[in-house]
Amino acid sequence: SAASDVYKRQSVNGFIKIYDPENNQIFVNKRNAIHYENMSYALAESLSNSGQGWIHEINFGNGGTSIDPTGIITYLTPNNTGVNASLYNQTFTKIIDDRSISNTDPVRNKTEVRHVSGTNYTDLIVSCLLDYGEPSGQDAFDTTTDANSLYVFDELGLRSWNPAGTGNLLTHVVFHPVQKSLNRLIQIDYTVRVQSLSGLTGE
């Protein structure tokens, strides 16, 4: 129903910005799809102090688009249904939980909660930096013509943590292909806005 749709769109929203922090070139700046089933479960797990459910990593992939011989790009629909949803073709993962011992750079790969007193929404800011040397095996320069190269990313998503190491996909965004290569940094600023359902403001 329309009311149900409004509920889903307004309770949790996602926004993503992907750019080169050296020259501020913006590659992606858009909303993204929320996996409402998995997100609701993760929120409940976190609130209940169950020891799992928080955002742990960003998954990167190269299966979100297809390009025909004339250069026309087709964007696939984000995977935001089914508890076992995943990226179309995951090729890299970066841990952004700054409390995790597996996070190799918690200063630049972290989560932060931002709230302004008196408002009915709170932002969770996820920061992720792909440094010059990562991922291992990338091309030296961002000049590839192969859109299916492992590190030409066109999709990414936030994933939660659980003890089995098989956390759930919480968000999924598909975008114009962006190559990660040795000659460039890529910064991802990912905002998840959690908003109450009364007095919907702050859009």
PLM regions with names:
Residues S4, K8-F153, W161-E203:
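Small cysteine-rich, disulfide-bonded extracellular modules of the LU/uPAR three-finger superfamily
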